[in-house]
Amino acid sequence: MDLLVPPLFAVVRNTHVPAVLRMSSISLLADCVDTYSLAILPYAQDLCTGFIDLLQLESSPANTVAKGEGKTTDDGNNDDLVSLDSNPTSRDSKLPPLRCAALHFLSLLMHASTKLICKGSTWITPFPGSMFRRANIVLEYISSTDEDRVVRVMAMEAKENLKQLQGTMLGLSELV
């Protein structure tokens, strides 16, 4: 895994790389978690923190309605919107698919961790309590405010996986 995870994570963190390559790297990391989650454990905390950072920095809140005006604060001009189809080499990290990929990775990592704990693995969780609190806050914010509906739903699912992992770690798996 030393040959795979660090270079892929370096691509994800590099803002000079096109968003499509960053998403592909996240997808490959998710496949690593899905294929053999024990192998990714040495990197789990760094990856989780990195993806929470990415989600926090690259979140794109929906336009709000100005008080008393009844219309959005956006002027309705969508010329600045860039899609991956029209510009596949875009480095715009605010695109929803990048957030979706990060949320998918986090969900898989949390689900795999929950399964390992339920199997009675001697695995010690690399996730400190502060990371759970931060992840919960970021996922709640994204699920409530993101401009993209799919991202909001995926954030809710990731938050549910986080809740299940916390419950399992506390021995409440039968209640979750």
Locations of regions flagged by a protein language model:
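Extended alpha-helical scaffold domains
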Residues: 28, 32, 36-39, 43-47, ...
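Eukaryotic acidic, Ser/Thr-rich intrinsically disordered low-complexity regions
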Residues: 135-176
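Extended parallel coiled-coil rod domains
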Residues: 85-93
